[in-house]
Structures are given as C-alpha cells and as structure tokens.
Regions:
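N-terminal intrinsically disordered/low-complexity leader segments
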Residues: 1-21, 83, 89-93, 228-231
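Amphipathic alpha-helical packing segments from all-alpha helical-bundle domains
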Residues: 82, 106, 120-133, 141-169
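Short, basic, alpha-helical segments at the C-terminal edge of helix-turn-helix-like DNA-binding modules
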Residues: 74-81, 87
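Hydrophobic/aromatic-rich alpha-helical bundle segments in the mid-to-C-terminal region
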Residues: 145-149, 153, 164-216, 228-231
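Solvent-exposed, amphipathic alpha-helical segments
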Residues: 25, 29-37, 91, 114, ...
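Helix-turn-helix
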Residues: 25, 29, 33-75
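Hydrophobic alpha-helical connector segments
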Residues: 85-125, 178-182
Length: 231
C-alpha cells in the first residue's frame, strides 16, 4: 500500500512498511537499493541487510530472487504512477466533453505539464526507470514486459482512445493512426526533459521545463492539428 505523504517526492512510490510485514520491508528496501545501485549492481545480500532480513527470508518471499523482486517492485511502482497519470489525463481531457478548438492547446499543455511533474512527484520510480534504460540489456525481458504492461502501455491505450475521440470531434487530424499520434505526443512533451534532467535526478529550472513542454505541444499540434487536414 502506498504512503500518501509525498512531500519530498519519494514516499508516494515506496511500499509502506507494515509492522511485522517482512515482505513489505523487503520490497521497500529493494526499491531504494535498485533505485540507487541499478539492477546489475544491486545484490540480494544488500537488499536483505537493508530490510533487516536474512537472505533465506528474502527467498522465502521472493523465490525467483533478484529478477522476481525487481519485477514486483517495478510493477507496483509503475502501477502507482499509472494511476496518477490516468487521474491527470481525465482531469484535462474528457472525450465526453471535448474542449473548444481555441482551448485545445491550453488543455494539452496543462496535461503535458502535469505529466512531466510526475518525474518530481515520483522520484523513486523514475530512478528505477533511468536504470532500466541504461541496463536494458541486463534486465530479463519478462521484467521489462511486466513493467510496460503495468504502466506505460495502459496509459498509452487510454490516451489513444482520447486522441481518436478528439479526431472524431474535428479537433485533431491523427492521419488514421491515433496510436502513433499518442506515441509522438508522449515523446514530444517529455523526452528532452527526461534526457536533460536524467529522469528527474537533476531537475531543470521551472521556466526551462515549461518552455520545453510548450514547444513539445506546439510541435505536436503542427503535425496533428486539424487545420492541417486537406479541405
């Protein structure tokens, strides 16, 4: 279960350590160790020590060892971020109540800024994501797939439905491929910020984050704005 105290941008992505709940203590420690050391360098001995558990106890809870533990932590953490992404998506883009054409850029920008802020709000999770990107060749494929399915793919599917609805309302021209429009939107609003901030490890100045996000939305609308539709 998640802690609701995210004042420092980290607690919201950590499992809560319940009294006597050794599995939660191990997961909590694993989240910190994987976020700090990455998948390859993290060791079962270190995780067990930080959890105050023996390696035997750890394997009793996670028989698959490091791979199973990493998958469990990533699925849980990705689920937390996914839920918050969907809350923010539905807040700013409701396909049942589409924005007026003149308000579309405003609403897309509000969504983009809310999503980019997740890198700060969920620092622990994005520390894990940063390590996944740098160590993808060493992380088991099933772990990568479980992470994608727990979070990014679900968000992408819901945004794709909304992109299609906006196109149906004449607000966007997705050129018959709302999934591709979704992929482009997500990259344009966040990729440069993620790269420059190392996935939120070194946050950019607020004004630079706002500028890059605005440029991303404007670039998206130049490619997919309904005004580009042939008449």
């Amino acid at each position: 279960m998640a802690s609701t105290d995210s004042k420092d941008g980290t607690a919201a992505t950590r499992p809560r350590r319940g009294r006597g709940d050794k599995a939660a203590a191990i997961a909590h420690a694993a989240c910190e160790v994987f976020g700090r050391d990455g998948y390859t360098r993290a060791s079962i001995d270190t995780i067990a020590a930080e959890a105050g558990a023996s390696t035997r106890t750890l394997y009793n809870h996670f028989p698959g060892g490091k791979a199973e533990l990493f998958r469990s932590v990533m699925q849980w953490s990705a689920g937390q971020v996914r839920d918050e992404q969907l809350v923010r998506l539905r807040k700013f883009l409701d396909p049942q109540r589409p924005p007026r054409p003149e308000d579309l850029e405003r609403d897309l920008l509000a969504l983009a800024r809310a999503w980019v802020a997740l890198m700060t709000d969920f620092r622990d999770h994005f520390a894990l994501v940063r390590h996944i990107h740098s160590e993808a060749g060493h992380v088991p494929t099933e772990v990568l797939d479980a992470w994608q399915e727990a979070g990014p793919r679900q968000v992408s599917r819901e945004l794709t439905v909304i992109m299609a609805a906006l196109a149906d309302h004449g607000l966007l021209d997705v050129h018959g491929d709302p999934a591709q429009a979704t992929a482009h939107f997500m990259v344009l609003i966040s990729a440069e910020i993620a790269q420059q901030s190392y996935w939120g490890v070194i946050p950019l100045p607020a004004e630079e984050t706002d500028r890059l996000t605005a440029v991303g939305v404007q670039t998206f609308l130049r490619a997919y704005g309904a005004a580009r539709r042939p008449r």
